[in-house]
């Protein structure tokens, strides 16, 4: 499977998991759900090394394994943010941003260590690498049998139902912001290596590392920066400035013909989109009281839809313009523009409430 196709299929599964989680997470509890999520993630990675050879059709085996760890990943996406939001921290926005920075460090670590492993031991030994990565969710699942987990809602308090959330105007603005956060991020991230190779004429191996790696490192740095200094920074203003910087990065990618500056544009995009996803989660938690699991699950769903639709939109526009990927990225300016509009609308709705 092409990595982009595999990613899209994982997103489809995660969308369904996001919706399904609303019905059972509160029923079985966050601890059981977290352990289940890690077990599914580990099982999928382990089965990746076994099923393709056990089944008559290797592709079917690969697909089943991917589906299993995608379910685990989708559950984790829904669960981890509310668990951290419930922690008794002084500044929840800082904690949320720091949490999401580890998504980026995980991305960087997997790419670097896997590349190093394959360079030393050869790609034929990829199964051992998959088993090594499976140790992380196994260990984390064991930890979650012991760590204290604070309740998201006060005792006796009930979270809002989906119907109650749907009646709130502010909820729909937050959903739009999450969609734009995912789309702004993945519109460049998923096309970064192709941009480096086809549009900037950079060697494929270097392009695969330079584009996505620079993007992930700066995205993680942005989140870690807010995680450290967030108590001194206005979140809404920081998100608006970041959306403007995102627009600048798209223009750099689309119109500057110098390859080095094009790669720099990809990196700047990572820096700019870093705060969008965790920032929207934090704004939602502060704006929608008693949102509970349903709020976080639906926001995760909107983010995943953005992660799928953003690069798809870029690809469609590029295809209509003679495969001009730069103009496809330029067309994605609509996402940070809508993000800015959403942030301003949230401020107005909060004053109205």
Regions inferred by a protein language model and the residue ranges of each:
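Interfacial helix-cap and linker-helix signal at transmembrane-aqueous boundaries
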Residues: 24-25, 116-122, 196-197, 229-230, ...
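Intracellular juxtamembrane helix-capping segments at the cytosolic ends
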Residues: 75-88, 275-288
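Extracytoplasmic gate region of multi-pass secondary transporters
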Residues: 168-221
């Amino acid at each position: 499977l092409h990595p982009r196709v595999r990613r899209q299929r994982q997103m489809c599964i995660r969308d369904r998991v996001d919706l399904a989680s609303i019905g059972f997470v509160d029923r079985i509890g966050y601890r059981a759900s977290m352990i289940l999520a890690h077990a599914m993630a580990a099982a999928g990675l382990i089965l990746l090394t076994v099923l393709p050879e056990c089944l008559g059709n290797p592709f079917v085996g690969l697909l089943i394994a991917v589906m299993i760890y995608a379910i685990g990943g989708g559950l984790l996406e829904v669960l981890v943010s509310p668990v951290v939001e419930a922690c008794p921290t002084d500044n929840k926005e800082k904690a949320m941003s720091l949490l999401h920075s580890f998504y980026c460090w995980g991305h960087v670590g997997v790419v670097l260590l896997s590349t190093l492993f394959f360079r030393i031991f050869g790609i034929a030994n990829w199964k051992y690498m998959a088993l090594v990565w499976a140790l992380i969710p196994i260990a984390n699942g064991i930890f979650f049998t012991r760590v204290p987990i604070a309740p998201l809602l006060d005792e006796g308090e009930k979270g809002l139902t989906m119907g109650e959330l749907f009646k709130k105007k502010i909820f729909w603005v937050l959903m739009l912001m999450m969609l734009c956060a995912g789309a702004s991020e993945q519109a460049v991230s998923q096309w970064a290596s192709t941009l480096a190779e086809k549009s900037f004429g950079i060697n494929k191996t270097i392009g695969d590392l330079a584009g996505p790696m620079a993007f992930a490192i700066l995205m993680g740095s942005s989140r870690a920066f807010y995680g450290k200094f967030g108590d001194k920074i206005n979140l809404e203003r920081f998100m608006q400035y970041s959306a403007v910087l995102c627009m600048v990065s798209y223009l750099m990618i689309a119109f500057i013909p110098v390859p080095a500056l094009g790669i720099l544009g990809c990196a700047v995009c990572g820096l700019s989109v870093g705060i969008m996803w965790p920032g929207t989660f934090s704004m939602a938690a502060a704006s929608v009281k008693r949102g509970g699991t349903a709020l976080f699950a639906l926001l995760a769903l909107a983010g995943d839809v953005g992660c799928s639709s953003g690069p798809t939109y870029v690809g469609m526009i590029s295809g209509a313009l003679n495969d001009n990927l730069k103009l496809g990225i330029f067309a994605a300016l609509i996402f940070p523009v809508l993000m800015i509009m959403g942030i301003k609308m949230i401020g107005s709705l909060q004053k109205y409430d």
